[in-house]
């Protein structure tokens, strides 16, 4: 199991407001994903991976410029997906990177 909070803290330590926004959103997404997957046991979903991936799917927003949600990076917000994927691959998480 990946320590998702530790990984998020590594990249968001200087942005507590953004970290809280990201965590609240990602936790809601993860809760919905897991709830839906549990309603469909016939799919044999890897619930641990699903929850981790949902919690990390927007990790790249820290690199973007979206002041309305406390993002003060330089990239366009639309880039957060591929930037998050690059970050997760760098962290040795290529499977999780595919979800960004």
Language-model segments: which ranges?
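Active-site flanking loop/helix segments enriched in acidic
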Residues: 2-25, 60-73
